[in-house]
Design a protein with these regions (language model features):
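Positively charged, low-complexity intrinsically disordered leader regions
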Residues: 1-12
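Short, glycine-rich nucleotide/cofactor-binding loops
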Residues: 19-33, 146-159
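Residues at the starts of beta-strands that form the adenosine-phosphate
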Residues: 22, 46-47
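Histidine-anchored nucleotide/phosphate-binding helix
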Residues: 31-43
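Short internal beta-strands
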Residues: 47-54
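N-terminal glycine-rich phosphate/adenylate-binding segment common to multiple enzyme folds
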Residues: 74-140
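Short, glycine-/small-residue-rich phosphate/pyrophosphate-handling segment
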Residues: 135-168
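Conserved small/polar residues in nucleotide/adenosyl-binding loops
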Residues: 169-175
C-alpha cells in the first residue's frame, strides 16, 4: 500500500475497505457535527449512532437521505448520553466515539470512569491530531496537546508508541520522524 499523504488519499483508502465504521456521536445536535456526519455518509465510510435529544436529531436533513446508516438513541441529558455512548463503544457496538455539542469535561468524565469507562487500567489518555496543509507535501501529526501537561518519561513513551501505531501501522507512512 502506498503511503497516505493527504485526506483525499485517506478517504480513498477508507472507501476501498468497503466497510463503514460505526461511530457513536454524543449530542450530535450542532451544525459542525452535522456537517462531519453528512460528509462521512456522502463518502460512504461511516454509519452513525446519534445519541441525544431525538426531537432535535430527527430534524436533520441527512437522516432523510441516509436513514439506513443512522440510528437515533433518544437521551435528553448530555451526561447520560455520554455514559450511553461510552457503554456502546466499550461493548463493541461502535468502533469510534465522537464528541458533538457536549462539554469536553462531561464527556471525559464518562470516558475516564474507572468501572464503566474506556481507558484500560494502567494506560494513559492521549490524542493524536492529523492536519493537512495544502502547501505541504504530507500529513502532519500532533500528539497530546495539553492532555497531559507534564508527562512522565513512561507517559511520553506511551504517547510516542500510540502515534507510531496510528501513523505507521494504519496510514503506512514511509519514514519515522518524531
Amino acid at each position: 500500500m502506498e503511503p497516505i499523504q493527504s485526506f483525499a488519499q485517506l478517504t480513498a483508502h477508507l472507501k476501498k475497505l468497503n466497510h463503514r465504521k460505526r461511530i457513536a456521536v454524543v449530542c450530535a445536535n450542532d451544525p459542525n457535527t452535522e456537517y462531519a456526519i453528512t460528509r462521512a455518509l456522502e463518502e460512504g465510510i461511516a454509519e452513525f449512532l446519534m445519541i441525544g435529544d431525538s426531537a432535535i436529531l430527527e430534524k436533520y436533513p441527512t437522516l432523510k437521505q441516509y436513514p439506513e446508516y443512522i440510528k437515533i438513541i433518544h437521551i435528553e441529558d448530555s451526561d447520560e448520553a455520554a455514559r450511553e455512548a461510552v457503554r456502546i463503544v466499550r461493548e463493541g457496538g461502535a468502533d469510534i466515539l465522537m464528541k458533538g455539542i457536549i462539554n469536553t469535561d462531561n464527556l471525559l468524565h464518562a470516558i475516564l470512569d474507572k468501572e464503566k469507562g474506556l481507558l484500560p487500567k494502567g494506560k494513559i489518555l492521549t490524542h493524536l491530531a492529523v492536519m493537512e496543509i495544502p502547501t505541504y507535501h504530507k500529513l502532519l501529526f500532533f500528539s497530546d496537546a495539553a492532555v497531559i501537561p507534564r508527562p512522565t518519561l513512561q507517559q511520553r513513551i506511551e504517547m510516542i508508541w500510540y502515534a507510531i501505531s496510528v501513523s505507521y501501522t494504519h496510514l503506512t507512512l514511509p519514514t519515522k520522524r518524531i
